[in-house]
Amino acid sequence: MQFGRLVLGVMLAGAIAGGWTAMGADSVKTHKKGHAAAAVTDNDPNLWLSDIHGAKAVAWAKERTDKTLATLKADPNYQRDYDSILKILNANDRIAFGNLDHGDVFNFWQDAQHVRGLWRKATIAEYAKADPKWDVLLDVDALDKAEGKPWVFQGADCAPGFKRCLVKLSPGGSDAAVVREFDPNTKTFLKDGFTLPVAKSDTTYLDADTILFGTDFGPGTMTKSSYPRIVKIWHRGQPITAAKTVYEAKPDDISARASVFRGPYGTIALISRGLTFFTSEYYYVMPDGTTMKLPIPVGADIKGVTQGNLLFTLRNAWTPEGGKEIPQGSLV
């Protein structure tokens, strides 16, 4: 454990000293790993199902949905159970679970009156109250009505200082989504902000005016699992064509994703190269845009950063070079 902390601590501390500017005590941001999809080829006889809004695919889904519902509704307890579950899901007294970020508690809330949902936040002190007062940042139902599109909120990543956020909205609930930059103070989308068209994209702020992102850049830029395999750096004011490639995974990999950690130690930008659903290689993004592979096992699961040192758990026992074996499940 000491060896792992020493190696990573020295490497990251040295790299931070070389360039990234400290961003203050903004909280850690990490990104969820997507589920690996089945590989698709041009010879796949079911490729037409990928067009989820296509007439043939919709008809196929409706036929099977109708059969399934008929079977479920044949149970005499169906309606009773349906009504009971719906009542629980729409209950206004259920716990509003939140995520602590930028010093506030963020929550996404859906009920019978807000079917598409409310993205909102509250101070920690307010959240501790029995009936907290929420500051609604985005009313997705109102956005649907204003733009005439069935948007589904897929999350947001906010810049240091909480001045801008990258909001992901899926048309109709598909895995693919648009990315639109949002001002949480004026509660409006920026006309000249960072935007990405509908795709399976992954985005995060490096600083207030720079993002690391992966998306569908065209033929050959997605993995066989249909996730981005190229991570680029994009500066505000540049056309997307000017974005520089930082890392490129192989087509057979699951994905390549960026994550950024911020704190008094500065800014740590990492890229995970997903080898399988449970294994990844990790690369540190240097200030000049190059990457450095970190000496940690592929089964490591990064949990965060403390005092400039990465914290990760082990899915398997690991013996660092020159060190002793560290047991499976250890926090390193």
What would you call each of these model-derived segments?
Residues M1-L8:
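Bacterial N-terminal signal peptides that target proteins for export
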